[in-house]
């Protein structure tokens, strides 16, 4: 069987109104991922329908966004010669950060859209910094609205230089910077004849050359549980996405924090594994699976539990333990002080955590300490903090298992901060 094309999850980031949605719309439109019947309608209108058609697509996308849902996920897959690409979310959506951290869709790469008319804006910086914090290692830049400056090379170069500085400071290397006009369709899918001075790839060509994300098969097995079903004739079937490691039929797995909470090992042998209703012998990172474990009942485990091998079980942080984390405060109405107890979201879990200590405030750009033991931290600050969970939960240091070490902090219906676990302090 021929090797299937790799799947890549892309997230679009950038300042509000710089053209993220238009760029997505143009990609889908020019790769013919807009429903056939709609295209037909406009073709019947002849010339008049042409410019109209793209505007209509954009309106549809906008309408869906205003109803509080991002672009209908069914339409956000498209294919390039060497990749299947899924657009997993477009920011501006209030749960964007939470979705990126807890979603089954960790982004492999980001497209940073910057309008040539504005250059780097506050949100451009914030999104780029966030992409770094969330572990997105590949980024490409689309300098949009080139039609508004008559496709001027000088203006492009000036903005490209700003973006380059920002991204290099954050530790990004080797990122293409592409001049585009999403509205006119220049250099998104079709090569532009209006910028003869540019000889690099179009946006879709650059996406097609994205490095394939490595599968972390060498890391310990971790499967955060999304749901637990009881299936007649089979038994209890936990469902989740393999984040790291490999699960094989016959393996013995243990569930945490269930085992810690019940004071007995909730574990058993894996009798069967299924993906998309097909039985399989082994599951790899990225696979969304259901699996049946001998001797584990429906009431033993729930969403937020994590399965791992018994010889390398998931790490549990209990209320008597703490963990040290680096966070970036995205949105807090006043200030965060010791004692603040919001809800932490990571993989499939949600647990209230208490801020025990504010160790240091960092310069978000360099990571250097600017203040030790600050009294408070506020929106825009990056900090090292000590957190204590109010009940047992599974989380791992980002250096050991990055896929299990990132989290969002939420309160009052919004994402207050994003962060990553530096180390875990167990109380003996």
Curated annotation (Swiss-Prot):
Keywords in alphabetical order, please.
Answer: Cytoplasm, Elongation factor, GTP-binding, Hydrolase, Magnesium, Metal-binding, Nucleotide-binding, Protein biosynthesis
GO CC terms in record = cytoplasm
Family annotation (Gene3D superfamilies): P-loop containing nucleotide triphosphate hydrolases (3.40.50.300), Translation factors (2.40.30.10)
The annotated region (G1) lies at: 14-21
Q: What is its EC number?
A: 3.6.5.3
According to its UniProt record, where is this protein mainly located?
Answer: cytoplasm
Catalytic activity field: GTP + H2O = GDP + phosphate + H(+)
The compartments listed are: Cytoplasm
According to the entry, every stretch annotated as the tr-type G domain falls at 5-215
Q: Where is this region: G5?
A: 181-183
Tell me the enzyme class: hydrolase
| Any Pfam family hit | GTP_EFTU
Query: Which residues are noted in the entry as Mg(2+)-binding?
Result: 21
Record protein name field: Elongation factor 1-alpha
